[in-house]
Amino acid sequence: MKILKYFAILFFFLPYSAQSNEWTLVYENSLNGDKVFIDISNIEKKDNLIYFWDMLSHKEYNDTHKYWSITAYIEANCDEFWYRKLNLLMHEKEMGMNPAFFETKNRSHIIIKPKKEKSGQFILLKTACDLSN
């Protein structure tokens, strides 16, 4: 019974990003080596919207803001080709492998409509839309 309690507590306190093990590389920034991943195991489709997690893992630790990676829960509309990050978590370790030390919510007013096909934002949204079909 103690073991079951331990695992329940551990699972509850781990951030979502660490619980997932299906992060797939979407693109790597050729200028700075940063990588963006998408969690292919948790893409949800509701009406004309999709919901998914992405992760930015920097090549180097960000000394200015004291983090290494960021995970974000995203809402997207593939027909109108836009997305917004509903929740953003900052992590002190690579690949979101520790509990988030900072969380932002209520970012739904920031809508991103990528135009350039070679931009990271465009590639992320196109990949998520393709995977949701």
PLM feature spans:
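Sec-dependent N-terminal signal peptides
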Residues: 4-18
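N-terminal secretory-pathway/extracellular module detecting exported/lumenal segments
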Residues: 19-72, 77-133
